[in-house]
């Protein structure tokens, strides 16, 4: 007789109780009970678990139906319940435990697509039953309903082979990468309601292409119960959220983006999950997907639970999920959310609320190993798909190869650059000279990682103000400041990311419950001109390889004057692979026009203006050179043997090149 003990999160330490007397031994099963080996899954080495876990339409013993399979190691009994049995716990719908590691399975004939179902999971002691959505379901009910829905992964005719071949052959380090981050539920709406994936594709693809972005980044589109979580507190990791349609609708959107040479990145959350009763939390009545130690599992700051990244079956769940999005939906990359929460045992915890690792440090060794393995898998099997880390600390080696003891990400968000520069642009220009280092410090560590410069959704919500409203001054100065900031960002080494709405100067913060304020573009000329500015700036970036071909090489950037704090001016050169490709940036962070401003240049010759943020067509004051030509002289400046004299626009960026 089993020694029954009700299991829950332990205050200190992990749940270590073993199930059954015959540990590690699997009972013999008939062919119809288990057609697959679960060895890789149980070892944490399975990368396509979604192909056999969950609910799959199959034919067994000449009967068509659905094979249900789930993992619940401490459950004493599991029922499949749903529309087909009036949601009742009946013995004929009881799943069979096909090995002692907790794999349960059941074949039910004559079930059709669209039927709703759940797993009724009885705990080890048999005294409590929880009703769980299928962790591997491909479809879920629209919130607030919580059941899984039987659906097939239908065939889809992709037309993006050329794109995928190019992705596999060519990396992005020496290519332009300008990402448009968006939330599908609030980018645009139709009569106040969500648009379908197909409806979104009709307007999004053309807009992104016209605006000159190279990639879109979708905030999470797996199923999640709370709109206000924006998808970052998930339940259905394999369910495409039903808010906007079905699997093939999403595939159609991605296919169209690819056919228009636009890449697709996806925000992905392998760090933590929501505690909703129908989800992964305490799945079999005990800690299953989360850590057994409550201090380690509980994420107090977000009200969520942290994945147990050392548990083999959880690793298989997450590795397979990453490859699911890449293989089934042709996603070009995953932006891994909350990496700091994964790496640090003391993240968000006070002294005494956490325990050190076996070496006495605060690094989560299981998470470190998980991330290395994740990135190794994607590099080996992802056919050119990338990973991006949202990581806010100075942890070393985020983008260093795994073979060199790095974590193996392709890129890392530069949160330091973002925080420094945003705090600077909110300052009155009178005080900016005292904080000049906020604008030049990033180049001190720029080549320590492969960075993306992010202005993301997190910066324009929860009282942080919209990007335009962060700018100092009256309306004219705000829009001038926005143009200046965006052009400085475009000139700075690193790939780029901008959140939706920033490109036309939306004044209100982002609101996930309504669409962007598209109406202001037509109603107010300055918003139209701001949108035209971002379009011109994006295309200028695309057309000039010096802005992206050597982002991660020191020879791609050279300061002209990094230290002019008194006048709050930064000047630098961007250099392309072809050393003749040079652009000179002069960024003035004051509202004063600087006449007869001396700038060092790399060579003698005639210099012309190629971009000016103060142009009248963008809403500026018109302090432009036009067709004027500046002849360099042999008068030295700083480290340069030659110089020119220019007029620098107020709160503006002037970009020059040799004729």
UniProtKB/Swiss-Prot annotation:
Glycosyltransferase recorded as keyword: yes
Region (Disordered): 1-25
Associated pathway: Glycan biosynthesis; glycogen biosynthesis
UniProt cross-references to HAMAP family, sorted A to Z: GlgB
Species per Swiss-Prot/TrEMBL record: Clostridium perfringens (strain ATCC 13124 / DSM 756 / JCM 1290 / NCIMB 6125 / NCTC 8237 / Type A)
Catalytically driven reaction(s): Transfers a segment of a (1->4)-alpha-D-glucan chain to a primary hydroxy group in a similar glucan chain
GO biological process terms on file: glycogen biosynthetic process
Gene: glgB
Recorded GO CC terms: cytosol
The enzyme's E.C. designation: 2.4.1.18
Active-site residue numbers: 337 (nucleophile), 390 (proton donor)
Name assigned to this protein: 1,4-alpha-glucan branching enzyme GlgB
Quaternary context: Monomer.
InterPro entries registered for this protein in UniProt: A-amylase/branching_C, Branching_enzy, GlgB, GlgB_N_E_set_prok, Glyco_hydro_13_cat_dom, Glyco_hydro_13_N, Glyco_hydro_b, Glycoside_hydrolase_SF
Compositional bias per record (Basic and acidic residues), positions renumbered to this chain: 1-12
Entry keyword set: Carbohydrate metabolism, Glycogen biosynthesis, Glycogen metabolism, Glycosyltransferase, Transferase
Name of the top EC class for this enzyme: transferase
Superkingdom in the source lineage: Bacteria
Family per similarity comment: Belongs to the glycosyl hydrolase 13 family. GlgB subfamily.
Keyword presence, Endoplasmic reticulum: no
Function: Catalyzes the formation of the alpha-1,6-glucosidic linkages in glycogen by scission of a 1,4-alpha-linked oligosaccharide from growing alpha-1,4-glucan chains and the subsequent attachment of the oligosaccharide to the alpha-1,6 position.
Gene Ontology MF term list: 1,4-alpha-glucan branching enzyme activity; cation binding; hydrolase activity, hydrolyzing O-glycosyl compounds
């Amino acid at each position: 007789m089993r020694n029954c003990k009700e299991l829950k999160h332990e205050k200190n330490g992990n749940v270590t109780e073993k199930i059954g007397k015959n540990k590690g031994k699997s009972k013999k099963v008939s062919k119809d009970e288990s057609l697959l080996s679960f060895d890789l899954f149980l070892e944490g080495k399975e990368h396509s678990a979604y192909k056999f876990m969950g609910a799959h339409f199959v034919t067994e013993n000449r009967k068509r139906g659905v094979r249900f399979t789930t993992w619940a190691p401490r459950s004493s009994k599991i029922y499949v319940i749903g529309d087909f049995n009036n949601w009742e716990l009946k013995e004929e719908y009881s799943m069979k435990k096909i090995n002692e590691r907790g794999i349960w399975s059941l074949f039910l004939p004559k079930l059709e697509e669209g039927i709703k179902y759940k797993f009724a999971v009885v705990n080890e002691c048999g005294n409590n039953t929880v009703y769980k959505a299928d962790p591997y379901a491909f479809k879920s009910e629209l919130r607030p309903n919580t059941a899984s829905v039987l659906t097939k992964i239908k065939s889809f005719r992709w037309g993006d082979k050329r794109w995928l071949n190019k992705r596999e052959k060519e990396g992005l380090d020496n290519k332009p990468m300008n990402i448009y981050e968006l939330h599908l539920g609030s980018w645009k709406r139709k009569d106040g309601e969500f648009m379908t994936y197909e409806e979104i594709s009709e307007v999004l693809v053309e807009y992104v292409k016209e605006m000159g972005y190279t990639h879109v980044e979708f905030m999470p589109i797996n199923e999640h119960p709370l709109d206000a979580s924006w998808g970052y507190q998930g339940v259905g990791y394999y369910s495409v959220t039903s808010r906007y349609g079905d699997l093939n609708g999403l595939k159609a959107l991605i296919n169209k983006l690819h056919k228009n040479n636009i890449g697709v990145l996806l925000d992905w959350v392998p760090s933590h999950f929501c505690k909703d009763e129908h989800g992964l939390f305490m799945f079999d009545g005990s800690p299953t997907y989360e850590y057994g130690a409550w201090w380690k599992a509980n994420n107090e700051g977000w009200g969520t639970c942290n994945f147990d990244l050392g548990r083999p079956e959880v690793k298989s769940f997450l590795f397979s999920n990453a490859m699911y999005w890449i293989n089934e939906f042709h996603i070009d990359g995953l932006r891994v959310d909350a990496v700091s929460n994964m790496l640090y045992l003391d993240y968000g915890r006070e002294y005494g609320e956490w325990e050190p690792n076996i070496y006495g440090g605060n690094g989560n060794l299981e998470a470190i190993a998980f991330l290395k393995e994740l990135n190794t898998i994607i590099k080996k099997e992802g056919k050119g798909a990338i990973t991006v880390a949202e990581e806010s600390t100075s942890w070393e080696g985020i983008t260093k190869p795994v073979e060199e003891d790095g974590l193996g990400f392709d890129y890392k968000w530069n949160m330091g650059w973002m925080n420094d520069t945003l705090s600077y642009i909110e300052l009155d220009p009178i005080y900016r000279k005292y904080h000049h280092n906020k604008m030049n410090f990033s180049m001190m560590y720029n080549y320590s990682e492969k960075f993306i410069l992010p202005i993301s959704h997190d910066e324009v919500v929860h009282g942080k103000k919209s990007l335009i409203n962060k700018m100092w001054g009256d309306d004219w100065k705000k829009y001038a400041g926005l143009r200046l900031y965006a052009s400085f960002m475009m000139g700075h080494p690193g790939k780029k990311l901008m959140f939706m709405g920033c490109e036309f100067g939306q004044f209100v913060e982002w609101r996930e419950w309504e669409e962007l304020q598209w109406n202001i573009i037509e109603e107010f000329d300055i918003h139209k001109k701001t949108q035209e500015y971002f379009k011109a700036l994006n295309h200028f970036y695309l057309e000039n390889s010096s802005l992206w071909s050597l982002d991660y090489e020191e020879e791609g950037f050279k300061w002209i004057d990094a230290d002019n704090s008194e006048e709050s001016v930064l000047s630098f050169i961007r250099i392309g692979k072809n050393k003749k490709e040079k652009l000179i940036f002069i960024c003035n962070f004051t509202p004063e026009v600087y006449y007869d401003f001396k700038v060092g240049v790399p060579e003698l010759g005639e210099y012309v203006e190629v971009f000016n943020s103060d142009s009248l067509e963008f809403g500026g004051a018109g302090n432009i050179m036009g067709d004027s030509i500046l002849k360099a002289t042999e008068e030295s400046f700083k480290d340069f043997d030659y110089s020119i004299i220019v007029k620098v626009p107020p709160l503006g960026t002037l970009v020059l090149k040799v004729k």
